[in-house]
UniProtKB/Swiss-Prot annotation:
This is Zinc finger protein basonuclin-2. Keywords: Disease variant, Isopeptide bond, Metal-binding, Nucleus, Phosphoprotein, Repeat, Transcription, Transcription regulation, Ubl conjugation, Zinc, Zinc-finger. One of its GO terms (cellular component) is fibrillar center. One of its GO terms (biological process) is roof of mouth development.
Length: 1099
């Protein structure tokens, strides 16, 4: 694209102007001598040819004008070049002479190609009706013009260009060519560029694009070429406006304005529609606050010397007031950020008026600063720096109240001069040495003088920009003096650095200054504007936020630089993303997802007495803060955003199931005695607990158990989810997550000891006795099926799963037991959200848990392992201590030996001891596994070990198995015999995470309860697996020895990590997988487990 004019500026494109010579007469223009020919004769002949050509062009003018008038008569016609008479305007530079010299023809000769993707248009051809549409490809003018525009500012955002007339012409054509109106934002920016050009250049650009100066100042064309008043105007589209806005980032004069427009675009989306009575309210507000331009200012402007007025103001009929304020007076950049009434212009040559000291502290005086600007001279080059200064400036005191205009416009620290002390200091400096400082510039913020404007700019950036850079993390109000410090802070993944409530005292002054002063901080704001220029990098303000899983973390976040500076900032077209959207989560095993918490949760600060443990940080439900779990490892490059969407059924299931995913001891008393009136649930992991008839006559107080349950299982519910989230990605946390089955066995042993030592005690025990240490958590056997399956709640099952779960639990009596108050009364509601200690009611169960944590924390939590008297202020610390096998190994083995000597439990001691030894020593103690895997043991002995309960448990649980057979095949792998021996006896059906066996196997177990060999080793294997699986405690992988929270997670681990090391059942049609060869062989050799399979032959 080009600049048009008789004297093209240097470095312009090779476009022909109307007064430039043709190719035939360039030798005459340059007076090139020819050998043997009289040069004077040649010059005279060429001059005659030139005159004749000009006469011919003059004759063609009327005909061309008639053609253009006929073309304008079309209904859909848009503005084109030379459609109106402009000779009456000052500075008229001539019109186009013929079609051969038309601007579009010259542009077509330069091959302005279309930049859209997959468009093969090689040259823009203006449409016959709409000039901005190409006749060849039907694409717009902007898409073609981008081929000639520079895009270096997108890749080098720190560099700015000098405003040149040919570049301004190119950018002006994007919005003025073929249009009849200019968007307001683009006109503001173009006005700013025009203000640094000469008058002749501005007029030449406008006339070259078919606009008059009057129409441009008005913002739209009033009449067409035929004199008809227009009532409809052609204007560029919004997408083209956004692309054009990017071009103004090339210049220091408009860069900061474009950045402010991006901020206002985000803020303007939430502006409400004004009411009908706004006009009167606005008039009242303006008159009462008197914030408009003072009459003296207007008088000064109207009566000022024309020689000192900018050329852009010299417009007939006083159209200068249609321009923005800065064009009326060519003030420098630092003062452009002030409100319109912040300056009082004086006539050139007048001295600075020095107010007396007595009037400086009076707030009823005028709040305008008095400025004596340097007169503008046409022979001077306008200052193009983003930060300039003005000499002879003396701010007066500002009123105590800050106007809304000041709050909304980001300005520099000049408002700090509202204090009388600052004004007095400037006044004193001005009085002391005004004569000696002639030619120097001084800082408007602190009053110091400097040798030149460059030094002032360096000083201003280094000293007075300390509150210009706010942290880009949404909700963090930290401010910094440099972009480097701000970016380093913003990139820190520690969420506590961005929490307002944990702010250090050293930051309060900056924050108070930021919020109290009239100088807002330029913060990074996410805009919804998005437009990708075809064939180019993204050109919109921002691109839509990408999927957090697919988005890689950016090296630094985008921030808008200071208004008056050119700071190193990242590319402006980059998207503004929150830290949560930029996080790239580490690849980890699938675990139970986080159940979002409700937005109405009461927020209680954690008590100071609670020790710092890897606990979960409760998400503060402020709209500006998204906090990450405190336990998340620092390997995560950015904090993880916890989504706040509410799953309606989450609370319902949490309340109904009493968090079955929690680890801990579940007291299931299978006694049919009338002393116990609560419903109990049956779970495969709890079959060891009912081990003798001696214990069946014992009842533990339901009051204390319910109280312990309400204070433990519900409180740990949110913490378990976060543990599941992080345990697979951080193996070293496995020891901390071993909170499941150790509780079961330790508390069972504790219960056995208490019952054996006190055989004659009453059935109900007082609330102050040690029974409070026994906490009750109910493991619903339908939990895995309804929550962890591929159709479960966590995977999108939703309400249908909720209804199905409710029907199952109601029909099979697996629902949550009834709640009891401390007095033993049955509560009316299944889950009354009340505190069982102080009887207070809350809105949600989560509020109850917070209440327990903050109010009833004085009740210490004793270790659940019998014989260990360690007490902790938090359940999390107690559970972590209780789950540590190394701390209780000697204690547990000693108690087991004592229990083995008890003659009242002959059939229990060996079985229970083996169970504990398996758990305590794991794969390092194969004796327990050998006892378990003794396939030749008689079924009667096995059944006597189980006391008849294990079989019923397995039958009832297997009835609920809804698994389907899988066609997955896995290759067997050979590994050490020790790993094979240490494998789990329980099979894993690969396509059903939650089922323990396939449908045929479970059906057979359900319908053959009396077969002596039908359960045998399989039931013992199920017990062994459940002894490792608790409800949410440590389940050890027998291959890699990692700990997992539940059986579902372990099965997924087997499927994703150890699939090649699993061993498939040899019976055709049976898809059971085993982690050891011995377990697989014992399963494959049991014909009773494969009756319903079509092919029952064993390989």
């Amino acid at each position: 694209m080009a600049h048009l004019g008789p004297t093209p500026p240097p470095h312009s494109l090779n476009y022909k102007s109307e007064d430039r010579l043709s190719e035939q007469d360039w030798p005459a223009y340059f007076k090139v001598p020819c050998c043997g020919v009289d040069t004077s004769q040649i010059e005279s002949e060429e001059a005659e040819v030139d005159v004749r050509e000009r006469e011919t062009q003059r004759d063609r003018e009327p005909k061309r004008a008639r053609d253009l008038t006929l073309r304008d008569s079309c209904t859909d016609n848009s503005m084109q070049f030379g459609t109106r008479t402009t000779t009456a305007e000052p500075g008229f530079m001539g019109t186009w002479q013929n079609a051969d010299t038309n601007l579009l023809f010259r542009m077509s000769q330069q091959a302005i190609r279309c930049t859209l993707v997959n468009c093969t248009c090689e040259c823009f051809q203006p449409g016959k009706i709409n000039l901005r549409t190409c006749d060849q490809c039907k694409h717009g003018w902007v898409a073609h013009a981008l081929d000639k525009l520079s895009t270096q500012h997108l890749y080098h955002p720190t560099q700015v260009e000098i405003v040149q007339s040919n570049v301004v012409f190119d950018i002006s054509s994007l919005m003025l060519y073929g249009t009849q109106a200019v968007p307001v934002r683009l006109k503001i920016l173009l006005d700013r560029l025009f203000s640094v050009l000469k008058q002749e250049e501005v007029l030449h650009i406008l006339h070259g694009l078919g606009w008059t100066l009057r129409d441009y100042v008005r913002g739209y064309i009033l009449q067409d070429a035929a004199g008809k008043v227009l009532d409809r105007w052609a204007i560029m589209s919004r997408e083209e406006e956004i692309i054009t806005l990017q071009q103004f980032l090339r210049f220091g004069e408009t860069k900061s304005i474009v950045e402010l427009m991006a901020i206002q675009e985000k803020e303007g989306q939430a502006v409400a529609v004004p009411s009908s009575k706004t006009d009167s309210d606005i008039r009242t507000f303006i008159e009462s606050n008197n914030r408009t331009r003072s009459p003296s200012l207007l008088a000064h402007l109207e009566n000022s010397n024309p020689s000192s007025i900018h050329h852009f103001e010299n417009i007939p009929n006083s159209l200068a007031f249609l321009l923005p304020f800065q064009y009326i007076n060519p003030v420098s950049a630092p003062l452009l950020g002030l409100p319109p009434n912040g300056l009082l212009l004086e006539q050139p040559g007048l001295r600075l008026r020095e107010p007396s000291l007595s009037t400086q502290n009076e707030y009823n005086e005028s709040s305008e600063s008095e400025v004596s600007p340097t007169p503008y001279k046409n022979d001077q080059t306008p200052n193009r720096n983003a930060l300039t200064s003005i000499t002879n400036v003396e701010p007066k005191t500002e009123p105590a109240c800050v106007s809304p205009i000041q709050n909304s416009a980001p300005v520099s620290d000049l408002t700090k001069t509202e204090h009388p002390k600052s004004s007095f200091r400037i006044h004193r400096m001005r009085r002391m040495g005004s004569a000696s400082r002639k030619g120097r510039v001084f800082c408007n913020a602190c009053g110091k003088t400097f040798y030149d404007k460059g030094t002032l700019k360096i000083h201003y950036n280094a000293v007075h920009l300390k509150i210009k850079h706010r942290c880009t993390i949404e909700g963090c109000n930290m401010v910094f003096s440099s972009l480097r410090s701000r970016n380093r802070h913003s990139a820190n993944p520690n969420p506590r650095l961005h929490m307002p409530m944990l702010r250090n005292n050293r930051d309060k002054d900056l924050i108070r200054a930021t919020s109290g002063a009239a100088t807002p901080v330029i913060a990074s704001t996410k805009s919804n504007l998005a437009l990708t220029s075809p064939g180019r990098p993204p050109m919109g303000f921002t691109t839509p936020p990408l999927d957090p899983v697919l988005q890689n973390p950016l090296p630094s976040q985008l921030v808008f630089s200071g208004l008056k500076t050119v700071q190193p900032v990242p590319p402006f077209y980059r998207s503004l993303l929150t830290p949560g959207e930029m996080v790239s989560p580490p690849t980890s095993l699938p675990t139970s997802p986080i159940i979002p918490t409700s937005g109405t949760i009461e927020q209680h600060p954690p008590p100071p007495s609670e020790p710092v443990v890897p606990a979960v940080m409760m998400a503060t439900h402020e709209p500006s803060a998204d906090l990450a779990p405190k336990k998340k490892p620092r390997k995560s490059s950015m904090p993880v955003k916890i989504e706040k969407e509410i799953i309606d059924t989450a609370d319902e299931f949490d309340d109904e199931d009493d968090d079955p995913n929690d680890g801990g001891a579940v007291v299931n008393d299978m006694s049919h005695d009338n002393h116990c009136h609560s419903q109990e649930e049956m779970s495969p992991g709890m079959s060891v607990k009912d081990f003798s008839k001696h214990n069946r006559t014992r009842c533990i107080s339901r009051t204390e158990i319910r109280r312990a349950d309400s204070m433990t299982s519900e409180d740990q519910e949110p913490e378990r989810d976060y543990e599941n989230e992080s345990e697979s990605s951080e193996p070293k946390l496995g020891e901390e997550s071993m909170e499941g089955d150790e509780h079961i066995h330790s508390e069972v042993s504790e219960k056995v000891l208490m019952n054996s030592e006190r055989p004659d005690e009453n059935h109900s025990e007082p609330s102050h006795q040690d029974v409070i240490k026994v906490k009750e958590e109910f493991t619903d056997p339908t939990y895995d099926m309804f929550y962890m399956s591929q159709y479960g709640l966590y995977n999108g099952g939703g309400a249908s799963m909720a209804a199905l779960h409710e029907s199952f639990t109601s029909s099979l009596n697996y629902g949550s037991p009834q709640k009891f108050s401390p007095e033993g009364d049955l509560c009316s509601s299944p889950d009354p959200k009340i505190c069982y200690v102080c009887k207070k009611s809350f809105k949600s169960s989560y509020s109850v848990k917070l209440h327990y944590r903050n109010v009833h924390l004085k009740e210490m939590h004793v270790c659940t392992v019998a014989g260990c008297n360690a007490a902790f202020p938090s359940r999390r610390s107690r559970d972590r201590h209780s789950a540590n096998i190394n701390l209780h190994r000697k204690l547990l083995t000693k108690e087991l030996d004592d229990m083995g000597l008890d003659s009242s439990q002959p059939s229990l001691s060996k079985d229970l001891r083996d169970e504990f030894l398996v758990k305590i020593y794991g794969a390092q103690h194969p004796m327990g596994l050998d006892v378990r895997e003794d396939a030749s043991s008689p079924a009667g002995t096995e059944d006597s070990h189980l006391n008849g309960y294990g079989r019923g448990m397995a039958e009832d649980y297997m009835v609920l198995d809804l698994s389907t057979t899988s066609s997955l095949q896995s290759s067997s792998s050979i590994h050490s015999s020790r790993e094979s021996d240490a494998g789990s006896d329980e099979g894993i059906l690969l396509d059903d995470i939650d089922g323990a066996s396939d449908s045929g196997e479970s059906a057979h177990k359900a319908e053959a309860p009396a077969l002596p060999g039908s359960l045998g080793a399989e039931v013992s294997g199920s017990l062994m697996f459940s002894s490792l699986s608790g409800s949410n405690g440590g389940i050890m992988c027998n291959i890699c020895h990692k700990m997992y929270s539940n059986k579902g997670t372990l099965r997924v681990h087997y499927k994703t990590v150890h699939l090649r090391e699993m061993h498939k059942c040899k019976v055709p049609g049976c898809n059971m997988m085993f982690s050891s060869v011995r377990s697989r062989n014992r399963h494959s050799q049991n014909p009773n487990l494969h009756k319903n399979i079509p092919f029952t032959s064993v390989d």
